[in-house]
């Protein structure tokens, strides 16, 4: 039967043989005329009821006590290929009620939907009740941890459940979904939404665990999304120039951003005000265009926080690139921000047209250009060494294609270098290549592979490789560096050590449909984990 006709048989009560009265615990009622056959075919609960020797089996009028009359009505309408949704519940509550009702009717429940809803703090107990009903496993326990308020009263929970929650891997990745632009959190086993709507199109984003805020930019605007109350504040750059990149300061109190024409600004994302702006080439304060803003001072930044294509914070310094032949190191001191004459500007004929990739390890700056790799001391700006990049790229690959380049640190002596589809683990102090992995050959079955990013997570000791190809789409692989002796070069590489159990797709494929942008984090839910750890120690 055509589903439209089937739907009409329901809505117009054609040939119905059962008047079904749904009743909830508050004695609210809802009456629908249905067909026993349709209910029996689609639902084991009704099949058992109508085919058994129960008092109600042969009745034409039936009263049924259900968890929620509106949601059960929606489920029954779904049997007739006429999906409807009760509008008076927020999405998160509706989906939880739907799972409860599906469980009541002995229907298969779709736990995946829980990955995509945002449960507010006051709704956590409802989530807990729902999961308690459907059962605990690694997925549902991870969802509990991900949604639990940091200050939740742990005495409400069984001690064994708390132990299982403490064993859930820390959530170490925040990313933007390639499918719908929402932000998600993942820990390698599971991922779930932390925003319900699209927040970002292009540009960088930062995450402040202290303030529970996501900061991102698009064109001339900076957006601050509050994860606790689900609100967004917007700031527009006063000079109406595109914001090129943003960096969160290590104290997580400010954003430093750069915008054309060569202006670096310190921005308070709580008050949504610019603290100070300076013209990068001279260090001069730019205050005539901020007449309504009282200028303050830059605080001292103690350590590296982040590296972006245009901006790098190094201790108390900001390294900013405005073209490939001009690397300007800005020095942030207590009450000023000025170009440091000692550092000056580096002009090198070896740095050709194309992007420059920079990383920092303690007191060494690594600069990867299309020709050479430089090892620079930031205090004197001396070259410790300079090596040719010939060993870092596959000769079948054009080295000038700069979209395929990246660099990151593994430990004090070892860095990961990506050029094209060739990933090199390199001990720079020993000047030795530990291992080289051709991502195209090992992971993409010889098909064209585009590598977008490599990131190392020192907490989990995982090197993440973000790549995509025409066959399998976008993937993120994680390489466990513990499997490699970083002091001993591997001469005859056995790629079997990088088989699927060593380079694995990040997360559960059913949870992650695609990642547009991602950031490795180590502090999401850290307060909750600390509270759980203390509670377990006090209740041994």
Curated annotation (Swiss-Prot):
Tell me where the transmembrane regions lie: 356-376
Endpoints of the signal sequence: none
The entry's protein name is Putative BTB/POZ domain-containing protein R224
Residues forming the BTB domain are: 16-88
Mind telling me which CDD domains this protein's record contains?
A: BTB_POZ_ZBTB_KLHL-like (cd18186)
Q: Which cysteines are joined by disulfide bonds?
A: none
Q: What InterPro entries is this protein classified in?
A: BTB/POZ_dom, SKP1/BTB/POZ_sf
Taxonomic lineage of the native organism: Viruses, Varidnaviria, Bamfordvirae, Nucleocytoviricota, Megaviricetes
What cellular component GO annotations does this protein have?
membrane
The entry's keywords: Membrane, Transmembrane, Transmembrane helix
Give membrane topology per the record. Single-pass membrane protein
């Amino acid at each position: 039967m055509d589903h439209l006709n089937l739907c009409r048989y329901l809505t117009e009560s054609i040939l119905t043989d059962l008047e079904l009265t749904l009743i909830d615990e508050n004695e609210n009622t809802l009456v629908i005329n249905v067909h026993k056959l349709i209910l029996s075919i689609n639902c084991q609960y009704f099949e058992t009821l109508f085919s058994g020797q129960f008092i109600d089996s042969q009745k034409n009028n039936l009263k049924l006590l259900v968890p929620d009359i509106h949601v059960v009505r929606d489920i029954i309408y779904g049997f007739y290929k006429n999906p409807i949704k009760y509008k008076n519940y927020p999405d998160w509550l509706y989906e939880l009620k739907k799972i409860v009702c599906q469980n009541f009717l002995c229907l298969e429940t779709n736990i995946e939907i829980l990955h995509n809803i945002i449960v507010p703090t006051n709704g956590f107990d409802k989530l807990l009740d729902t999961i308690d009903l459907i059962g605990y496993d690694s997925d549902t326990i991870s969802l509990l941890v991900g949604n639990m308020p940091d200050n939740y009263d742990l005495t409400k929970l069984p001690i064994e459940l708390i132990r299982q929650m403490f064993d859930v891997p820390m959530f170490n990745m925040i990313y933007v979904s390639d499918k719908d632009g929402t932000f998600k959190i993942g820990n390698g086993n599971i991922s779930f939404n932390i925003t319900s709507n699209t927040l970002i199109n292009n540009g960088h984003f930062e995450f402040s665990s202290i303030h529970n805020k996501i900061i991102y930019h698009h064109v001339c605007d900076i957006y601050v999304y509050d994860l606790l109350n689900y609100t967004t504040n917007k700031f527009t750059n006063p000079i109406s120039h595109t914001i090129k990149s943003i960096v969160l300061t290590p104290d997580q109190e400010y954003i430093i951003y750069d915008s054309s024409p060569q202006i670096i600004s310190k921005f308070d994302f709580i008050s949504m005000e610019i603290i100070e702006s300076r013209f990068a080439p001279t260090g001069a304060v730019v205050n005539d265009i901020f007449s309504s803003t009282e200028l303050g001072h830059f605080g001292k930044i103690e350590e590296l926080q982040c590296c972006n294509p245009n901006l790098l914070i190094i201790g108390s310094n900001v390294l900013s690139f405005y073209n490939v032949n001009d690397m300007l190191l800005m020095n942030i001191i207590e009450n000023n921000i000025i170009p440091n004459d000692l550092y000056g500007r580096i002009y090198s004929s070896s740095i050709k047209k194309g992007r420059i990739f920079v990383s920092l390890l303690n007191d060494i700056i690594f600069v990867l250009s299309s020709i050479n790799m430089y090892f620079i001391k930031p205090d004197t700006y001396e070259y410790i060494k300079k090596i040719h990049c010939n060993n870092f790229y596959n000769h079948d690959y054009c080295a000038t294609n700069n979209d395929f380049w990246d660099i990151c640190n593994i430990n004090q002596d070892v860095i990961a270098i990506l050029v094209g589809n060739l990933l090199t683990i390199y001990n720079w102090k020993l000047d030795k290549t530990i291992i080289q992995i051709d991502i195209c050959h090992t992971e993409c079955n010889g098909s064209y592979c585009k590598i977008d990013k490599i990131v190392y997570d020192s907490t989990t000791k995982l090197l993440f490789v973000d790549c995509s190809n025409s066959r399998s789409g976008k993937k993120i692989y994680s390489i466990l560096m513990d499997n490699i002796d970083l002091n001993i070069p591997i001469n005859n590489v056995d790629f079997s050590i990088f088989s699927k159990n060593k380079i694995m797709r990040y997360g559960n494929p059913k949870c992650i449909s695609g990642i547009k942008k991602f950031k490795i984090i180590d502090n999401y839910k850290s307060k909750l984990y600390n509270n759980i750890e203390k509670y377990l120690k006090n209740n041994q």
